[in-house]
C-alpha cells in the first residue's frame, strides 16, 4: 500500500510540476508578447509623427480637402493604436495607477481642445455645464475614459448635432453625463455595448468601429471603482453616465 501511495504521490507531483511549467511558460510568453506589442506601438507612432510633420510643412502645396482627409485618417490610426496600448496595460493595472484629486473640467477641456478640429468640421453644438468638480481617480485612466466617450459621441453624431457634458451632484455621489443627439443605440444592442469586440448595428454601418473603446471604458471604470451606465433611444439620443463616490 505504501508503495502504491508513493507511486500516486509521484504521479501527482509530476503532473503538478508539468502544470507549473506550462503556467510559467505561458506567463513568460505573455510578457514577451506584451513587450513586442509595446515596441510595435512605438514603431507605429514614429511614421505617424513624420507624416504629420510632412503635412504641416507642405500644407500650402496640398489640397485642403485631401490634407483634412489624411489628417482625419492619421487621427483615427492614433486612436486605434492608443486603444491597443491601453488594452495591453490593463493586465498590469494594479501596478500602473495613482489615486489622487482629479479635476473633471480640466480633463474635459483638454480633450475638447484635442478634438476641436473635428467638432468644428461637423458643426457640433457643444454645451458644457457645471463641470468644476474634483474626484478621486487616476488622471491618465480617467482621461482615456472621458476621451472614449467623447470620441464615441463625435463619431456617431451628424452635422449640427448637440453634445452636452455636465455634472449632477447629490449628497453621496457625483455624476458626469455625456449626452448627444446622434444616431442612438438600438434597444437590442444596449446590454452588449460594453462587451469586448461588440460593434452592434452602428458599428456594422461604421467601418471605423473596433468594439474596443467602450469595453475598455467599462473595465477601467470597474477597476477604479466608478460606475458607468448608458441610456439611449434609437435615432434620438445617447447618454452615458459615470458615477463617482463623493469623497471630496
Question: At which residue positions do the language-model features occur?
Answer:
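Short helix-loop "hinge" at the ATP-lid/N-box region of the Bergerat-fold HATPase_c
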Residues: 153-154
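Short conserved segment of the HATPase_c
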Residues: 185-198
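Short beta-strand/loop element within the Bergerat-fold HATPase_c
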Residues: 160-172
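Acidic ATP/Mg2+-coordinating residue in the GHKL
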Residues: 180
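Short conserved segments within the C-terminal catalytic ATPase subdomain
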Residues: 116-127
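Conserved micro-motifs of the catalytic ATP-binding
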Residues: 93-97, 130, 134-137
Amino acid at each position: 500500500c505504501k508503495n502504491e501511495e508513493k507511486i500516486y504521490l509521484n504521479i501527482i507531483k509530476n503532473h503538478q510540476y508539468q502544470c507549473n511549467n506550462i503556467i510559467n511558460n505561458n506567463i513568460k510568453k505573455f510578457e514577451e508578447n506584451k513587450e513586442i506589442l509595446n515596441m510595435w506601438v512605438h514603431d507605429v507612432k514614429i511614421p505617424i509623427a513624420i507624416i504629420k510633420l510632412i503635412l504641416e510643412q507642405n500644407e500650402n502645396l496640398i489640397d485642403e480637402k485631401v490634407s483634412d482627409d489624411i489628417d482625419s485618417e492619421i487621427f483615427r490610426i492614433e486612436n486605434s493604436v492608443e486603444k491597443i496600448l491601453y488594452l495591453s496595460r490593463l493586465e498590469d493595472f494594479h501596478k500602473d495607477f495613482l489615486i489622487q484629486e482629479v479635476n473633471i473640467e480640466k480633463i474635459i477641456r483638454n480633450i475638447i481642445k484635442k478634438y476641436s478640429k473635428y467638432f468644428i468640421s461637423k458643426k457640433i453644438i457643444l454645451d458644457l455645464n457645471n463641470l468644476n468638480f474634483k474626484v478621486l481617480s487616476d488622471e491618465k485612466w480617467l482621461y482615456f475614459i472621458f476621451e472614449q466617450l467623447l470620441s464615441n459621441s463625435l463619431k456617431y453624431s451628424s452635422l449640427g448635432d448637440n453634445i452636452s457634458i455636465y455634472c449632477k451632484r447629490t449628497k453621496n455621489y457625483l455624476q458626469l453625463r455625456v449626452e448627444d443627439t446622434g444616431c442612438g443605440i438600438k434597444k437590442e444592442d444596449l446590454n452588449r455595448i460594453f462587451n469586448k469586440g461588440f460593434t452592434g448595428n452602428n458599428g456594422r454601418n461604421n467601418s471605423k468601429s473596433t468594439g474596443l473603446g467602450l469595453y475598455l471604458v467599462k473595465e477601467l471604470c470597474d477597476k477604479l471603482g466608478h460606475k458607468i451606465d448608458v441610456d439611449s433611444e434609437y435615432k434620438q439620443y445617447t447618454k452615458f453616465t459615470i458615477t463617482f463616490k463623493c469623497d471630496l
